Each structure stands twice: as structure tokens, then as C-alpha cells.
Amino acid sequence: MIALRLSKAKILQACVQKQERTIEDFERGIAELKTQLYSQEEIESQEHRPSPERRELLLRMEHELGFLNYEMAVLRQIEAEKPLDVVDLGAVVVTNQRTFFISTSLERVEIEGRTVIGISQKAPIYQVMKGKRAGESFDYGGVRFAILEVY
């Protein structure tokens, strides 16, 4: 199994890059929405005033951007070279079903043709695998996961 091990540094790098792209997309969307809102505010006509829905959308996007930046800070705290043997923040958890990276809720990243699922410490599946080691198992969503390796 060790020979097939994905590099935690590569997994972390892929997660950071995905998060950076997501943040850039949100920043671009927020900038475009602000441009639309503020250019419409300059128009005197009552019928061209920005809708409350657009303002609400802007607030939601700004809130989500704040959360994305928080998740990036979590990723930046992870030490790829730190060895782990229990499921905790920064661990790669290889199971008989999937490979997880305990980090942030990034969903899927592809590394060397393999899928790794990023999950946060708040995810329900993390709660059932937390503190477990290779050789242990857990049940989630009606599926039994056998932990093959933690690093």
C-alpha cells in the first residue's frame, strides 16, 4: 500500500489551488455585481433602482467569500510533512471505499488520476471516523468503511 500512497503535499497543493480558483470566481462575481448595482444607483429613474434581491445576493456572496477565505486559512495551517496515524485535521484517510483528506469541504480533487474527497471537521462523516486508526472501521450512510491507512 505504501508504494501506491498519494503524496499529502500534492493533495494539499491541489486543494489549495481549487480553493484559490473558487475564491477568484467569487471575487469576480462580487465585483461584477457591485459594478451593476453601483452603476444602476447613478440612474435617477425609480424604475432602474437595484432590486433588493440583487443586494441580498451580494450580501450572500460576500458572506460565502468570507467562509471560503476561512477555509483557505484552515488549509494553510495544515503541515503536509506532519505524520499522522489517527484521523484528525490534515490526515489522509484511505478506506476500502474512498480516500478522504481531512481539511475543508472541497468535495473532490483529482490527483494522479485518483479521487480524493476533502471533508471538514464539521462534516458528519468526520464525526464518525474522528480519532480512528488504520485497521478500524466505521459505518456511515449505511456503508461500512474499513480504514486501510492514515497518514
What are these regions (language model features)?
Residues 81-140, 145:
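Non-DNA-binding regulatory cores of transcription-related proteins
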Residues 147-150:
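Conserved hydrophobic positions within beta-strands
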